[in-house]
UniProtKB/Swiss-Prot annotation:
Primary localization: mitochondrion
One of the record's GO molecular function terms: RNA binding
Family membership noted in the UniProt record: Belongs to the PPR family. PCMP-E subfamily.
Gene of this entry: PCMP-E66
InterPro entries documented for this protein: E_motif, Pentatricopeptide_rpt, PPR_At4g14850-like_plant, TPR-like_helical_dom_sf
UniProt keyword annotations, A-Z: Mitochondrion, Repeat, Transit peptide
Coiled-coil stretches noted in the UniProt entry, renumbered to this chain: none
Protein name per its UniProtKB record: Putative pentatricopeptide repeat-containing protein At1g69350, mitochondrial
Stretch list, region Type E motif: 674-749
A biological-process GO annotation: RNA modification
Pfam families: E_motif, PPR, PPR_2
Annotated stretches, region: Type E(+) motif: 750-780
Annotated Gene Ontology cellular component terms: mitochondrion
Length: 787
């Protein structure tokens, strides 16, 4: 047989393999010798003819475990994973003596689909039973299978049990973490690998660089680049392109340009990476110049290049250049039917306002490319062209183009943004009729109903979802919290916590806001404790905690959270200023404002609003005037809220004439909040003459603010101005405005009970009045002791 081995190696075509096969048949070697049979099986598969491999295998009367392994391996080569697994089952049914050579190929077949993970688990069991689980190749194959099917915990168990962890094992685990979106874990594993003395190769470094790009952390990116430089890797085009993309995704375009310049032989991938980097940084003109240089250098662009260039044209409105690029693609027959570039073309025409051209593209690809439809619907929705977005949705249905989950979710979001909830309900009906159970769609429905105030409808959708992800739970949690259903939000969080459901930063953010809105201090502290244990604490949750503690009356806790923050955003500074303001600590509020400015953070409208509010709470008129005038120095123009707060400060101090003069000098018409501040000051200082003097100004106000109408009508009632009282109440009634009833809330053992006037819930009232009775008794006892 040895004389035939060079012949197998020299077979460079399917025809030559067939000729050798015929010769072996004539000589009779295929009937008794398994070696040429296995070589033929491999050769046919290598030439892309797995069916011929199968025929050779079936013709041999006594295939052994090794021959099965060869055919299984060949099926995996040819991506015939089901066939490979079927062969394995057949082998298991025929013999218990399975060669360890079989297992790596079967495990690779199982790695190709999550559906085959259960088979992979059984194969793993047989490997352990057969005592071959210490084989390095098998261990790496197990690692690969669990990693590729998303079962990272089992992959780590296999890895931890390996007596020797070589480069392949480490690289497989790092790649598995990256493929499953666990970028931080992948980088941690890479560090452990280096610390363990295992030298990474170029392939591993490319994976790590791509992970850094996804993470977007420049500090880590530079550290990895330094590792590459120290190890003196050969900076080939692939590694350079990865580094280039990494730096652009981390916001360091200058480093991307430096790496690009170092590439000696720039290919289409290099140029495309640089063009995409410019696009990512919104340097569209540089992207177009790079494309021009690429063409001049004789490098043929690919579809990815053209897609990036079209995006550049769209960003700066160069429609003529965009059409030229598309014409270039058509002339080179790169995209004859708009198939690949349809999405970029739709975005280009939409950005340039050529909506008729968008729809022309849609007509060309309508039967084939639902992505283009979705793109235009999404673009219309984001640009506020909600009617057009919904018109496209209707057009799709009319043309019998089946909307997918993205289409439905985008259309539902469009209805939400336009306040067209009835139309959103119709789409909801379509979702029910077509039995769409996609999580993205269901979450959009919860969001739409929640933001329109229909919390009951949102809750109904939520309760009908069988499998809820953390996003779904968060959508409902935020829905309750944003609509004032804070008790329900806290109850939902408790259920999540005690059911050991997955939580993330958004979960904690929503429940902290719920605790804040009803002043539930004990529950807020408990949530804070659980947040620390979970390791999910971040800038946003810290800022929410500051607000929560301040509103619940624990300023010391708010200060503790603020001081412990490693970094502070403008929202964090603003929240702390607001916290001091709520507690009348004007000196601390101003000191924090000054610290913020010294740290290099420029104050915005919200910061000044909180400073003015702090001045208002403490009655600090002179400070209020100073900071109101200071706004212009920082390029901030006072809006209606700033004026309302400043007028309130002046009015409460009794300086009503100055307040009125300020209103008249406003650069825009004063709204109900501004006039309401002046009216409230007049009520406090019993200046009905001023209210009568500004009666015409007040009657011109049209608003849906029930507080404004209630304040003014109550003043008229106190003064016996019944005609004006009736006029205002009539205006409220005709506008269908109702005063939102107030409520009280009390916290007992971390449980919050809410009640309003006329509350008849006996379970709550009994507990609440029992607690209040105890407080009354304590008060009476203290009074007796004092006397």
């Amino acid at each position: 047989m040895t004389q035939y081995m060079p012949l197998f190696r020299s077979c460079s075509s399917l025809r030559l393999v067939s000729q050798l096969h015929a010769h072996l048949l004539v000589t009779g070697r295929l009937r008794r010798d398994p070696l040429p049979v296995t070589k033929l099986i491999e050769s046919y598969a290598f030439m892309g003819s797995p069916d011929s491999s199968r025929l050779v295998f079936e013709a041999f009367p006594y295939p052994d475990s090794f021959m099965y392994g060869v055919l299984i391996k060949c099926n995996v080569w040819c991506h015939l994973l089901d066939a490979a697994i079927d062969l394995y089952h057949r082998l298991v049914s025929e013999t218990t003596q399975i060669s360890k050579f079989v297992f790596p190929s079967v495990l690779r077949a199982c790695a190709g689909s999550r559906e085959h993970l259960s088979v992979g688990g059984k194969v793993h069991g047989r490997i352990i039973k057969g005592g071959v689980d210490d084989d390095a190749v098998i261990e790496t194959s197990l690692l690969c299978m669990y990693g590729q099917t998303g079962n990272l915990s089992d992959a780590e168990k296999v890895f931890d049990g390996m007596p020797v962890r070589d480069l392949v094992a480490w690289s497989t685990l790092v790649s598995s973490c990256l493929e499953n979106g666990e970028v931080v874990k992948a980088l941690r594993m890479f560090k452990c690998m280096v610390d363990d003395g295992v030298e990474p190769d170029a392939v591993t470094m490319i994976s790590v660089v791509e992970g850094c790009a996804e993470l977007g952390c420049l500090r880590i990116a530079r550290s990895v680049h330094g590792q590459i430089t120290r190890k003196m890797f050969d900076l080939d085009e692939t590694l350079c392109n990865s580094l280039l993309t990494m730096y652009s995704k981390c916001g360091d375009l200058l480093s991307s340009e430096r790496i690009f310049e170092k590439i000696a032989k720039k290919n289409a991938v290099s140029w495309t990476a640089m063009i995409s980097s410019y696009n990512r940084g919104e340097f569209s003109e540089k992207a177009l110049r790079s494309f021009s240089e690429m063409i001049k250098s004789g490098i043929e662009p690919n579809l990815v290049t053209l897609y990036s260039v079209l995006s550049s044209c769209g960003l700066i409105g160069l429609i003529r250049e965009g059409k030229s690029v598309h014409g270039f693609a058509v002339r080179r027959e790169l995209d004859p039917n708009y198939e690949s570039l349809s999405l970029a073309l739709v975005e280009l025409y939409a950005e340039c306002g050529k909506l008729s051209d968008c729809e022309t593209v849609l007509r060309v690809v309508s039967d084939r490319n639902i992505v283009a439809w979705n793109s235009l619907i999404s673009l219309y929705a984001h640009r506020g062209m909600v009617i057009q977005a919904l018109g496209l949705f209707r057009q799709m249905v009319t043309q019998r183009i089946k909307p997918d989950a993205f289409t439905l979710a985008s259309s539902i979001s469009a209805c939400e943004n336009a306040g067209l909830v009835p139309l959103g309900k119709q789409i909801h009906g379509h979702v029910i009729r077509t039995d769409v159970s996609d999580e993205f769609v269901q979450n959009s429905l919860i969001d739409m109903y929640s933001k329109s105030g229909s919390v009951d409808s949102a809750s109904t959708v939520f309760n009908q979802i069988k499998h809820r992800s953390v996003v779904t739970w968060n959508s409902m949690l935020c829905g309750f919290s944003q609509n004032g259903n804070s008790v329900e939000a806290i109850s939902l969080f408790d259920y999540m916590y005690h059911s050991y459901l997955e939580m993330n930063e958004v979960t904690f953010l929503a429940v902290i806001q719920a605790c804040s809105s009803i002043g539930s201090l004990e529950k807020g502290k408990w949530v804070h404790h659980k947040l620390i244990i979970s390791g999910l604490k971040d800038l946003f949750t810290d800022t929410a905690l500051i607000d929560m503690y301040a509103k619940c009356g624990d300023l010391n806790a708010a200060e503790t959270v603020f001081r412990a923050m490693s970094s502070r955003s403008i929202v964090s500074w603003s929240s702390m200023i607001n916290a001091y303001g709520m507690h009348g600590r004007i000196g601390s509020a101003i000191s924090t404002f000054n610290q913020m400015v010294e740290s290099g953070t420029k104050p915005n409208e919200v910061v000044f609003m909180n400073v003015l509010s702090a001045c208002g709470h403490s009655g600090s008129v002179e400070e209020g005037k100073y900071y109101f005038n200071l706004m212009k120095s920082f390029g901030v123009s006072p809006n209606s809220e700033h004026f309302a707060c400043f007028i309130d400060l002046l009015s409460r101090s009794g300086d009503l004439k100055e307040a009125y003069r300020t209103i008249k000098e406003m650069p825009f018409l004063a709204d109900a909040s501004v006039w309401g501040s002046l009216v409230n000051g007049c009520r406090i200082h019993q200046k009905m003459d001023i209210i009568k003097a500004i009666k015409n100004d007040l009657s011109d106000i049209v608003t849906d603010d029930t507080g404004y109408y209630t304040l003014l009508s109550n003043i008229y009632a106190e003064e016996g101005e019944w005609e004006e009282f009736r006029r205002l109440r009539s205006a409220m009634k005709s506008s269908n405005l109702k005063k939102v009833p107030g409520y009280s809330a009390i916290e007992i053992d971390q449980k919050v009970f809410r009640f309003g006037a006329g509350e008849e819930n006996r379970i709550q009232t009994d507990e609440i009045y029992r607690f209040l009775g105890n407080l009354q008794n304590l008060t009476n006892e203290e009074h007796v002791v004092d006397s």
